[in-house]
Amino acid sequence: MSLNSLDLPGKPEDTRVVVAMSGGVDSSVVAGILKREGYDVVGVTLQLYDHGAAVHRAGSCCAGQDIEDARRVSESLGIPHYVLDYEARFREAVIDPFANSYVSGETPIPCVSCNQTVKFADLLQTARDLGADALATGHYIRSRANGAHRALYRPVDTDRDQSYFLFATTQEQIDYLRFPLGHLPKAQVREIAEELGLTVAKKQDSQDICFVPQGKYSDIISRLKPEAANPGDIVHIDGRTLGRHDGIVHYTVGQRRGIGVATGEALYVVHLDAANARVIVGPREALETHKVFLRDVNWLGDTPIADLPKSGMEVFAKVRSTRPPRPAVLRHADGQTWVELVDGESGIAPGQACVLYSDDSNAACVFGGGFIGRSEREPQAEEMLRRLMANADKASAA
């Protein structure tokens, strides 16, 4: 049997596709394209959080006006549309872990958790319950057949590359998901929205952290976890106490501005000592990192990660969503997985992701990745930090 444009057997009119509709232009265009091609399209929007603070805020998603926009687009396309209340699930799977991660001194990525749990687990099951052959989203990433399964690839428009946020997608989910925008530049997507007469054609793109009004994540965390706003010391990596802070929630590794001390030297946050409520700062060179240890690894490569050679596997690694993939070596031994960064990186924070690719082109295959549990700095900085932490432990035990 021949395959349709979604690589599924059968004619489009005999193929049901659930489209995850956030109310933005991207997912709306996905619904419009598939409807135009003759697919049996069903729109589903998740209400993910209390939208009171976001109803009049441009750049949110899955709340208030966005739900209404998704409904209007669905109505104009003539497709059924359902709104599912996932607020409790979103709080449990995304918001609470986000706050807990900050309290422990990490810098989390809630979008990965949302994709990993709510969107690509719970919504995927809902799509199956609706009898859909696939779940389509407006993410900028590509997938295509690779043997008996499908593999993920970076999109044509690398300025919109969302593969960093999708590294935790499992093989089973990848096989069921479809990403119709992966081969299109954003400008063309907006042109298609105009052609389709969609009311959201000129709508502003959504922000990454959708549930944080005005981007003030510290307000949300302080409300959920008041201990994150406990004051403490700002300490230089050489041991000097430089001042006080109003809560580690206001800081992240790599930060330079707004540290709150003036010493005449450029200082950066190099570590958050959550146990002792300390913000540890130092010179830029104290941020240089060549090795990161990963947890919760989702490996999509052909060779099982436990079977990697002792010499490791040459890959390209991305440690921030805004940075390109750079040369690295992936290693696994004694139950640990780590990545050696050939050229080094600065400002790597625990809780962030390290995503692995076959190369640095826009056709690169996504090998998966993991969350950064810890990193190793240059030897001198690593020793200074180790000594500082050991002294704090001794003081606490005394």
Swiss-Prot record:
GO terms for cellular component: cytoplasm. GO terms for molecular function: ATP binding; tRNA binding; tRNA-uridine 2-sulfurtransferase activity. Belongs to the MnmA/TRMU family. GO terms for biological process: tRNA wobble position uridine thiolation. The keyword Cell membrane does not apply. The record marks 139, 352 as: Interaction with tRNA. It is found in: Cytoplasm. Disulfide bonds join 114-210. ATP binds at residues 20-27, 46, 138. InterPro entries: MnmA-like, MnmA-like_C, MnmA-like_central, MnmA-like_central_sf, Rossmann-like_a/b/a_fold. It is an enzyme of class 2 (transferase). It catalyses: S-sulfanyl-L-cysteinyl-[protein] + uridine(34) in tRNA + AH2 + ATP = 2-thiouridine(34) in tRNA + L-cysteinyl-[protein] + A + AMP + diphosphate + H(+). Its EC number is 2.8.1.13. Catalyzes the 2-thiolation of uridine at the wobble position (U34) of tRNA, leading to the formation of s(2)U34. Keywords: ATP-binding, Cytoplasm, Disulfide bond, Nucleotide-binding, RNA-binding, Transferase, tRNA processing, tRNA-binding. This is tRNA-specific 2-thiouridylase MnmA. The active site is at residues 114, 210. The keyword RNA-binding applies. Residues 160-162 are annotated as: Interaction with tRNA.
